[in-house]
């Protein structure tokens, strides 16, 4: 059952025909190389930024615009 869940998750991250990088929806520090569905990770204290297709330093408070800051704001609402 767990394998079915993982396949559904990776099919949404790397849809058929998509080539490039895509952010992991559950882990701000991870991203995928599509179409191979290879999970990659940013270095410590960095998060993946889809707009620049690169890892950027994490801003841990509400002033940032990255994934971690967005999750931080959502937790405070």
Swiss-Prot record:
What are the subcellular locations of this protein?
Answer: Host nucleus; Virion
Keywords assigned: Host nucleus, Virion
Q: Which GO terms describe its cellular component?
A: extracellular region; host cell nucleus; virion component
Q: What is this protein called?
A: Protein AC145
**Biological function:** Plays a role in primary oral infection of the host.
Gene Ontology molecular function: chitin binding
